[in-house]
Design a protein with these regions (language model features):
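Gram-negative and organellar
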Residues: 1-349
Length: 349
């Protein structure tokens, strides 16, 4: 996604963004088929009261089925229930102006807790219902539920325990449901006395189930992913990062056929600051699969500091591979040119 906004008045702004989506999860929920789509969105929002936003958007979507035009309007509201306890709520309705889209409604509720210096947590529940498309022979109506919960517990000055769960379910009126459930547990080490080294270890259980296609049956994928990420800053111009990840996956395919997959990935990056605003980097990655399969990627990049903690980098991988998304994380491992944007922030943002 790429976008921007313009402040036209003290409490009113115009905004626009372009979005590119591909795969099984669309902007409205989980799709029944993999697809690609572009979207151009522009609108206006106003803050009439403190912590209250009213918005209206015009969305132009170019999907496989053709071009759809939609008008979306809604409201977002924040409430301070107590010191360190804040609630949020939002409502949205989408009306199709032209095309074969469906009318949709959405509600969202959230809760954030920051009162305790040792504990922090948040949760968010979203509901979205999309109606039937009149031009199609079947009933395409569906309801999507998204529930996210996150918690952080500071163990001491340097160590923090992290937990997160992401639950996404889409129930179709005329067929089965699609489910994604991701549970993560992590441990972060960030020394307070210096900024030379930090590390994050994480283990994740991921479950994906698709019962929306009666001919294919109940498809399921279950995986365990373990990873460790570390950063080392030995001196002012040098930055070294490394990642080690492993994955064990079991898939249930059509007609109950079971398939198992396991792989590991090791990657590293060395960055040298030429000046305060320009850096050069070297990246290497190796992914090892089953039966001795091995792939590697090597590349270089150059970065420029746009503003404090915001870097824009461009690079080229001389060799590469299509890495597993759960193993590679946000690293780009394909062969060819790439552009990436990095933004560093903490819990005070």
């Amino acid at each position: 996604a790429l976008g921007g906004d313009y402040q036209v008045a003290e409490r009113t702004r115009l905004y626009g963004r372009w979005e590119r989506q591909s795969g099984w999860v669309s902007l409205a929920g989980v799709t029944d088929t993999g697809r690609s789509a572009n979207a151009l969105v522009f609108g206006v929002d106003s803050s009439y009261l403190r912590d209250t936003q009213v918005f209206s958007e015009y969305r132009l979507r170019d999907a496989v089925s053709g071009r759809d035009a939609q008008v979306a309007s809604g409201i977002r509201q924040g409430f301070d229930l107590a010191e360190g306890l804040r609630a949020t709520a939002a409502a949205e309705t989408v009306q199709v102006v032209s095309g074969d889209g469906a009318r949709a409604r959405a509600l969202a509720f959230g809760l954030d807790y920051t009162a305790d210096p040792l504990w922090k947590g948040s949760t968010r529940l979203e509901w979205r219902h999309s109606g039937d498309v009149a031009s199609t022979p079947g009933n395409d109506a569906f309801t999507t539920w998204l529930w996210q919960v996150m918690a952080a517990r500071k163990l001491d000055r340097d160590w923090t325990l992290l937990a997160r769960n992401h639950y996404l379910r889409t129930d179709y009126t005329a067929r089965g449901d699609v489910l994604q459930d991701r549970a993560q547990l992590g441990l972060a080490w960030r020394p307070v006395d210096h900024n030379r080294f930090n590390a994050l270890a994480k283990i994740e259980h991921k479950l994906e189930r698709d019962s929306s296609n009666a001919a294919a049956g109940d498809l399921q994928s279950r995986a365990w992913i373990a990873s460790t990420h570390a950063d080392w800053h030995p001196s002012r111009p040098w930055w070294l990062t490394g990642r080690l990840a492993a994955k064990w996956q079991t898939d249930r395919l059509e007609q109950g056929v079971t398939d198992k997959f396991r792989a590991t990935l090791v990657s590293g990056r060395v960055v040298y600051d030429i000046t305060e605003r320009i850096d050069l980097g070297l990246m290497a990655a190796i992914q090892a699969g089953q039966h001795g399969a091995r792939q590697h990627a090597v590349g270089v990049e150059a970065g420029y500091l746009l503003q404090q903690n915001l870097w824009l980098s461009a690079g080229y991988n001389r060799s590469g591979f299509k890495g597993d998304a759960d193993l590679a994380g946000y690293d780009y491992t394909l062969r060819g040119a790439f552009v990436r944007l990095r933004f560093k922030f903490d819990e005070t943002l």
